[in-house]
Amino acid sequence: MEHTRSGSDILVRIDPGEEIHTVLKELADDLGFDAAAITSGIGRTRENSYGYMDEEGVYQRRSLDPPSELVSLSGNIARTEKGDAFTHIHCCWSDDDNNVLAGHLFQATVHVVAEIHIRVMDHASMTRCPLAEFELSLIHI
């Protein structure tokens, strides 16, 4: 991973074999920010796990293992109540037949490259707190 920063904007290049959530949490820790918007991301990933939350508040997971084009990625980076970096990301992929798949991102390993733009909110604080009745952590602003 490499990154460059200009004011509140960070452009991150994530390299083959690196996992997106892991790299972005490490970046938040290394740079010391508590609140950021992930505004865009493109690239090619593999071993993708994504899904949606059903009516009962339980995430339903899907796998997309072959390398696929990451056509859109967005979300945010906050902190847990214990101070750990927490990423919340949604993605859209296109498979090799141009079928689009999308949802909440659980895991994605970069296959070729991922290029992600982050906007740090220097004077903001966002904390993720568990919501007991759902498999979810709400953001407190």
Predicted regions and their residues:
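Short, structured patches in soluble enzyme cores that scaffold and shape functional sites
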Residues: 16, 93-95, 118-122
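Short, well-structured hydrophobic secondary-structure segments
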Residues: 15-71
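Mid-chain, well-packed structural core segment of small domains
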Residues: 64-105
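Generic N-terminal amphipathic, Lys/Arg-enriched alpha-helix
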Residues: 1-12
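Structural motif
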Residues: 9-11, 35-39, 68-69, 89-90, ...
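C-terminal binding/interaction regions
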Residues: 136
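Conserved small/polar residues in nucleotide/adenosyl-binding loops
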Residues: 139-141
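Structural signature of FAD isoalloxazine-binding scaffolds in flavoprotein oxidoreductases
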Residues: 106-120
